[in-house]
Curated annotation (Swiss-Prot):
Known EC number: 3.1.1.47
Family of the protein in this entry: Belongs to the AB hydrolase superfamily. Lipase family.
Organism of origin: Caenorhabditis elegans
InterPro entries in alphabetical order: AB_hydrolase_fold, PAF_acetylhydro_eukaryote
Protein name: Platelet-activating factor acetylhydrolase homolog 2
Xref: Pfam families: PAF-AH_p_II
Gene: paf-2
GO biological process per UniProt: lipid catabolic process; morphogenesis of embryonic epithelium
MF GO annotations: 1-alkyl-2-acetylglycerophosphocholine esterase activity
Cysteines paired by S-S bonds: none
Main EC class the enzyme belongs to: hydrolase
Catalytic activity: a 1-O-alkyl-2-acetyl-sn-glycero-3-phosphocholine + H2O = a 1-O-alkyl-sn-glycero-3-phosphocholine + acetate + H(+)
Active-site residues annotated for this sequence: S238 (nucleophile), D261 (charge relay system), H316 (charge relay system)
GO cellular component: cytosol; endoplasmic reticulum membrane
Matches recorded under SUPFAM superfamilies: alpha/beta-Hydrolases (SSF53474)
């Protein structure tokens, strides 16, 4: 199935490092890890080269992801089928599926990535593959807390693996028990991020987790002694931003956090108080609002190593793949592209992330001042600023 009004077939990395990028999905049975287990896509440096277009994985692994996204957006399956066939088509991620890990470095730093509400493990591939091209191993978790647009788990029945869908849970704003539901979800998300870190530690020790449901065909032994477990970071967008804060509050094994346009609502007072690891906040001024920023400012005050920056002319989805899935005119129509070019927003997100991960607050601030001051400010503000 081709796309007729789309950008190039492979999503090009915006700030490519020295490495080609490989990827591999890993799903582990919940009976081993408890609850619903773990599903994630690992992105990592590779020395391999793509044989042909089929080496690159599809951005939409199954049509159900589009249908679930449509449900989240209030669009019918029929309409999403049209959008998928005419716009998305066989869009592919810029990484080589089933590639081997690069042997050019002794060890690789690790990052766990948490998607936003209605997201998936593939919706941030531009960012994740770009980080991997700079020498990071990125574990993009697909959350099973009913916040992903759609996901699934595999269960054994009569000797065969059966796919059980996990659909998005739609919650009306101000619905009774809304906070309780969202806080429970963020708790589940934290559990999955910690599980991802634990699985990476197992792989680094040369141990393959029990009951691997997806990924049995891969040589995981190559991860042995290749990961820098002492400096793990957690990164997330929106709901994933809250997840990254709550994860770093839960365990200091996450040495740093990065929050893209974070949604603070799901965090309870304990999580807010305990989020004290050095954190980079990258906000979109047009999306943030005062009530949300009040919580964020409280967390920012916990550590002198925290840094908050605001992107001007950007949109909430500028950290995801969506601005690059659609041609510019359609991206603007759908509200996934703002006044500032998506490529510039993504470049800033990637380069500031690298600067913060490698050189902390001072490194990110220096880069912002030298390169991105035309559209990124140290002022913390939301949409109310424009109503004055």
């Amino acid at each position: 199935m081709g796309s007729y009004i789309s950008s190039p077939q492979v999503l090009t990395r915006q700030v490519s490092g020295q490495f080609q990028v490989g990827c591999k999905d890993l799903m582990i049975d919940g009976t081993v890890l408890g609850d619903r287990g773990l599903f994630m896509r690992l992105y990592f440096p590779t020395d391999s080269q793509a044989a042909d277009i089929s080496s690159y994985p599809l951005w939409l692994p199954k049509p159900q992801y589009a249908h679930g996204l449509g449900e989240y957006l209030g669009q019918s399956s029929q309409k999403m089928n049209v959008i998928t066939s005419t716009v998305v088509g066989e869009k592919r991620e810029d990484c080589i599926e089933n590639a081997q890990m690069s042997t050019k470095c002794d060890k690789w730093p690790i990052v766990v990535f948490s998607h936003g509400l209605g997201g998936s493990r593939t919706f941030y591939s531009t960012y994740c593959t770009s980080l991997a091209s700079h020498g990071y191993v990125v574990a993009a978790v697909e959350h099973k807390d009913h916040s992903a647009c759609w996901t699934y788990q595999l269960t054994e029945k009569n000797g065969e693996l059966v796919e059980q869908p996990i659909k998005i849970k739609l919650i009306e704003k101000n619905e009774k028990n809304e906070f309780k539901i969202r806080n429970q979800q963020v708790g589940k998300r934290v559990t999955e991020c910690v599980k991802a870190l634990n699985v990476l530690e197992q792989l680094n020790l040369g141990t393959v987790p029990e009951k691997v449901l997806i990924g049995n065909d891969y040589n995981w032994a190559q991860f042995k002694n290749k990961l820098v477990m002492s400096s793990a970071s957690v990164i997330g967008h929106s709901f994933g931003g809250a997840t990254s804060l709550a994860s770093s509050a839960y365990t200091t094994d996450f040495q740093k956090a990065i929050v893209f346009d974070g949604w603070m609502y799901p965090l309870d007072s304990t999580q807010q108080e305990q989020a004290k690891q050095p954190t980079l906040f990258l906000n979109v001024g047009d999306w943030q609002w005062n009530e949300n920023l009040d919580v964020m400012k409280k967390i920012i005050s916990h550590n002198d190593g925290n840094l908050a920056l605001t992107l001007n002319g950007a949109v909430h989805q500028c950290f995801s793949d969506f601005p690059f899935i659609f041609p510019s005119w359609l991206a603007k129509k759908f509200g996934v592209q703002g006044r500032t070019e998506p490529s510039l927003c993504m470049q800033a997100a990637i380069e500031l992330s690298l600067a913060f991960l490698e050189n902390g607050k001072d490194g990110a601030q220096k880069l912002k001042d030298e390169k991105f001051s035309s559209f990124i400010s140290n002022e913390i503000y939301g949409r109310e600023k424009y109503k004055l």
